[in-house]
């Protein structure tokens, strides 16, 4: 049990972090969206950033409402918010993974014909790949939607005589739904790891070919991408830790530690959101022109 003053402190920190992320996401969407309307085209990285900004904006509001409903035991409201949070959470994971793939194919210096063909195909079909990530999210959220309906049914049956066999089956399916949500995040995480490893291999190759100490534009691009990927890796790892804590949550009072953990995780997400703003040449150029 932690002191109430400390709980309130971390609650305030979490809210401030969340509001900052919401403002940053809104700024990314507004600036790049205006640029899109003016020039009628955007680079693939800016397409990802707009999509990620919209997804993260919705995710952050859903996360705040979800956490407060969980803390104050508003179960009926929580059930309706959970499915929204899970949808945008999975979508954000996929968009982050696509961002690492873009960094990999754009910055890496591999010259193998298969890699060059993949680079050409991915860049050409990037809008369809974004749409595909949305469709994959819609499909993977189906078990969660069913589990959400089951959870509502369990809540309505709470004060009624229950059929123990039916209840056990419903609760078991709800556990499978949680496992399916975890698996849905593993695939983009593996995609992220593969892209990061390829990018690190490309950077190592560049260092071996340019050992004179001079930092050419290609090297700077590698370091910029790796810095963003390093922060993103921390965010991914932190989120998987939250899943682990959820699984072993019976070991301690999760309501007491909820705001401490949320403030810790969203500090990294705030760092990543800031890094995304700095990774877009279009966004930096427009913001510098406004100053």
Swiss-Prot record:
Is Glycoprotein found in the keyword set? yes
UniProt xrefs under Pfam families = TAS2R
GO biological process, any: detection of chemical stimulus involved in sensory perception of bitter taste
> How is the protein disposed in the membrane?
Multi-pass membrane protein
Q: Which residues cross the membrane?
A: 2-22, 42-62, 85-105, 126-146, 183-203, 229-249, 258-278
Q: Extracellular side: which ranges?
A: 1, 63-84, 147-182, 250-257
Keyword annotations from UniProtKB, A to Z:
Cell membrane, G-protein coupled receptor, Glycoprotein, Membrane, Receptor, Sensory transduction, Taste, Transducer, Transmembrane, Transmembrane helix
Q: Which GO terms describe its cellular component?
A: membrane; plasma membrane
Compartments where located: Cell membrane
* An MF annotation (GO) of this entry: G protein-coupled receptor activity
- Where is it predominantly found? membrane
Which residue ranges does the entry give as Cytoplasmic-facing topology? 23-41, 106-125, 204-228, 279-291
Q: List the glycosylation sites.
A: 80, 163
Any keyword Cell membrane? yes
Q: What does this protein do?
A: Receptor that may play a role in the perception of bitterness and is gustducin-linked. May play a role in sensing the chemical composition of the gastrointestinal content. The activity of this receptor may stimulate alpha gustducin, mediate PLC-beta-2 activation and lead to the gating of TRPM5.
Q: Which family does it belong to?
A: Belongs to the G-protein coupled receptor T2R family.
Q: How does it assemble?
A: Interacts with RTP3 and RTP4.
* Further remarks about this protein from its record: Most taste cells may be activated by a limited number of bitter compounds; individual taste cells can discriminate among bitter stimuli.
User: What's the name of the protein?
Assistant: Taste receptor type 2 member 16
User: What organism is this sequence from?
Assistant: Gorilla gorilla gorilla
Query: Taxonomic classification, please?
Result: Eukaryota, Metazoa, Chordata, Craniata, Vertebrata
Its gene name is TAS2R16
